[in-house]
A protein has these predicted regions:
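Cell-envelope/ECM-targeting effectors and their regulatory/trafficking segments
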Residues: 1-87
Length: 87
């Protein structure tokens, strides 16, 4: 699942790695179904919307700094890329 890069940008390669991690179909775009799978993976309520609760759960799961973000910000994406690279 290794991305081999850490740039903080959630582009198609990062999206595809997230999809593989959560067991979704891999097309490089995060669908509502993918987001729900991500939420289940990190222990957040699966509503299909990335908000502050999902971000806190994701940041906890991957060991990222909890920064109060309401979306997949660059710092969290960078931490997620590192986490996925280590898998």
């Amino acid at each position: 699942m290794s991305l081999q890069f850490v740039d903080g940008i959630r582009g198609p390669k990062t999206n595809a790695a997230i999809e593989r991690w959560v067991g979704g179909s891999v097309d490089g775009t995060l669908s509502r179904t993918d987001v729900k799978a991500l939420q289940r993976k990190v222990g957040a309520a699966p509503d299909g919307v990335i908000g502050p609760r999902t971000m806190r759960a994701l940041q906890t799961k991957i060991g990222a700094t909890k920064n109060g973000s309401r979306h997949l910000d660059r710092a969290t994406v960078r931490s997620l890329q590192r986490y996925l690279n280590a898998r």
